[in-house]
Swiss-Prot record:
Belongs to the myoviridae tail sheath protein family. Disulfide bonds: none annotated. This is Uncharacterized protein YqbK. It comes from the Bacteria. It holds the Pfam family Phage_sheath_1C. InterPro entries: Gp18_domIII_N, Phage_sheath-like_beta, Phage_sheath_subtilisin, Tail_sheath_C.
Length: 466
């Protein structure tokens, strides 16, 4: 099913749900339920060019095989401070580390990257059966796999290495003569054979383009582009977001740094922060936190004044006049409060600066954009569910009065929930929802009027369901 922006008098060929947002006065809107951010990273380990859903440290350990404190996962850590779920995408990989662990037997890291150089293979005599050996895989000197075998060909791949070769396995000789393994499962520093030759690879524009192409079929609320000086890639990213929002009806927000996107779907981060451990989160790195925080914003929440967890200062303190100027340019900034030594969001705005009658200054506020996006995405989802359920029962939603009532009931239920939770006000299902058949009589034209709690007037929606 297709989505996008519906232009009155211009019907679209592909079946779908089309929204045309118009604002007639000042308004403010609260956020709906959200929480998923798509994030590309250049990590030193993991499967490449595939989205992996991470909602907890346990997810990370199980699905990626790294600890959350791994240096290459800085952006993930920042995003997870506020996001519910991170769709992690490793952009590229370098060479895979390897080592000969016995004559004619090789262990090779499962993935390319420098993390493979932290893998150690230890071969010890099995204490129960001296005809067998224990082949133990360690990562960062912690045991992650152990196999008891008689021959090399019995070895099976694990989450970290693959084995090739045949024949007997020679017990590892500790360099200092100490025991190769203790009962705790930790590897003495002088034992085992360390893999080597693993390298990282710098992502190219093609890698980021592949990321965007893959993201097109994923569901997320925000998506980050954590790159510094690459105007071409940033322009591609902005075009990607506009296409998703305006042509496909997927109302997401993109977060990048130091780029004048001039669009409500683009957040332009130009400030950075200093973490308590001394790590500098430059603007391009801060896109991960902003995307995570924007995705995880709760119902009726603005990020204005929300603290940046773990930050102790901003990278560049600026005076009031410069803050005002940069805000007018659509820049997302952080501010340092010397009174309580905290760092927080200066103002939750996007990059829109060219205002029109249809997109006034209220569209510069991410809080308002989030609720508009939530209404679009949620109603699209619910209308799809209605259509699918009818088809599952062997029929379609009829282009009749019964069909009109089906759709009206669905929308009424949804907007009533928003009103009950103080997201909108003065909702009148009799006067705020108008449904009619389209010109071809194969779908519905829906007019909606919605007034946010703190808005002076109502937003008007034109929706087509075919």
């Amino acid at each position: 099913m297709n989505g996008g922006t519906f232009t009155p008098g211009k019907e679209k060929e592909r079946a779908g749900i089309y929204f045309n947002f118009k604002t007639t006065a000042e308004n403010r809107v609260s956020a709906g339920e959200r929480g998923t951010v798509a994030l590309p990273i250049a990590s030193s380990w993991g499967e490449v060019k595939k989205f992996i859903s991470i909602s907890s440290i346990e997810d990370l350990n199980k699905k990626v095989g790294l600890n959350i404190d791994d240096p290459s996962l800085l952006l993930l850590r920042e995003a997870m401070k506020k996001a519910n779920t991170v769709l992690l995408y490793r952009l590229t990989e370098g060479l895979r580390a390897s080592a000969d662990i016995s004559e004619g037997v090789k262990a090779t890291a499962l993935y390319g990257g420098t993390k493979g150089n932290d893998i150690i293979i230890s071969i010890t005599e099995n204490v129960i059966d001296s005809s067998k050996v224990d082949v133990t895989t360690y990562l960062d000197q912690s045991e992650v796999d152990k196999q008891t075998v008689s021959k090399a060909e019995e070895l099976k791949p694990n989450k970290y290495v693959t084995f090739t070769g045949k024949g007997d396995l020679t017990v590892t000789i500790p360099l200092t003569g100490t025991a190769p393994e203790d009962v705790s499962g930790a590897l003495p520093a002088t034992s085992g054979i360390r893999l080597s030759g693993g390298t990282d690879k710098t992502p190219t524009n093609a890698d980021y383009t592949a990321f965007l192409e893959a993201a097109e079929t994923e569901y997320f609320d925000t998506i980050a582009l954590p790159v510094e000086d690459n105007e071409q890639l940033k322009a591609t990213f902005v075009a990607f977001i506009k296409r998703l929002r305006d042509n496909q009806g997927q109302k997401v927000q993109g977060v990048l740094s130091n780029y004048k996107g001039d669009h409500e779907g683009i957040i332009n981060v130009t400030g950075g922060v200093l973490l308590e451990d001394g790590t500098e989160i430059t603007p391009e790195k801060a896109t991960a936190w902003v995307a995570g925080a924007s995705a995880g914003a709760t119902f009726n929440q603005s990020l204005t004044f929300v603290e940046y967890e773990g930050a102790v200062d901003v990278l560049n303190r600026i005076d009031n006049d410069e803050i005002v100027e940069r805000l007018s340019n659509g820049e997302f900034l952080f501010t340092y409060d010397s009174r309580d030594k905290s760092v927080s969001v200066e103002k939750d705005i996007n990059s829109l600066t060219s205002l029109t009658a249809e997109k006034n200054k209220m569209f510069q506020k991410n809080k308002i954009v989030r609720v508009l996006d939530a209404i679009n995405n949620d109603l699209t989802s619910q209308l799809k569910a209605l259509i699918k359920s009818r088809k599952a029962s062997g029929s379609d939603v009829p282009a009749t009065n019964d069909g009109l009532q089906f759709v009206k009931t669905l929308i009424t239920q949804y907007l009533s929930v928003l009103q009950d939770n103080e997201g909108i006000t003065d909702f009148d299902s009799e006067n705020d929802i108008t449904i009619a058949l389209n010109n071809d009589r194969d779908g519905f034209l829906i007019d909606l009027a919605v007034q946010p709690v703190d808005a002076a007037e109502k937003f008007y929606f034109n929706v087509e369901v075919k």
